[in-house]
Amino acid sequence: MYAIIETGGKQYKVSEGDTIAVEKLSVKQGEQIVFERILHLSTDGTVKIGQPYVEGCTVKGTVLSHERARKVVVVKYRPRKNYRRERGHRQWFSLVKIDKIEIEKTS
């Protein structure tokens, strides 16, 4: 079973037990988070595709930590003018462990 979720403007393919790095979430370390924007759900041969989201399905996870990515260095340079500038940036991200993919039973 897997699902494709949307968070932070990006899409992630997740299964139960996966650990993913997503854009920084405003949830404390160790707390539960519920993803409700499910774009695609595949279970035992059946596939549900959302228009735009799958109804009655949630993905639950636990925030493991908040970390910073490797530094991205941006260089500005003008030839023959002795002009050089170097700036660095480290983006925050959250590590999330996917605990459960829940599907609401419909009768």
From Swiss-Prot:
It holds the Pfam family Ribosomal_L21p. GO terms for biological process: translation. Keywords: Ribonucleoprotein, Ribosomal protein, RNA-binding, rRNA-binding. GO terms for molecular function: rRNA binding; structural constituent of ribosome. GO terms for cellular component: cytoplasm; ribonucleoprotein complex; ribosome. Coiled coil: none annotated. This protein binds to 23S rRNA in the presence of protein L20. Belongs to the bacterial ribosomal protein bL21 family. Part of the 50S ribosomal subunit. Contacts protein L20. This is Large ribosomal subunit protein bL21. It comes from Pseudothermotoga lettingae (strain ATCC BAA-301 / DSM 14385 / NBRC 107922 / TMO) (Thermotoga lettingae).
